[in-house]
């Protein structure tokens, strides 16, 4: 199975239009265009293929927030890192081969895009999961809410490392993952539900930083 994107090259910098945040002309961070990137997959398995799942995660998020966005320091490079899910999309039909750039997100939506089935050009049964901005903004009176669908990169502006954004497409042997409709669909729940059902997978990775020292 092969995954490609016309929006970025594998292991190259994510263009700012596909990020949630960008380096500000004044201050540190400004909101960006927040468009979802293009993804296309090929060489899919034959036989029992029934659906696809798309996940985007950042494996480089600081495990503690003590140093995040502090003027007098950077987040240490050796701090343990954890996953942050930016996009969870399940039950894409077996004949799907592409997601067009900007069709699942275009601009930042304060308090989050609607879900689990936003008004998007997708087939019946497709579900958008909650991304981890739901937890990140939980204490922000202006931004808190349920963040469904894609919301792009916005790493700490003082992080000492460049973050990676891993887009993975899974070919699955069931038409719908067994996750109760009333449950809030998270990245962790999807990865658990995928166990034993993945026929093939492919990934592409983009990098991004808001640290002027690293962003160039």
Regions found by a protein language model. Name each.
Residues 1-216:
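N-terminus-centered regions that define maturation/targeting leaders and the start
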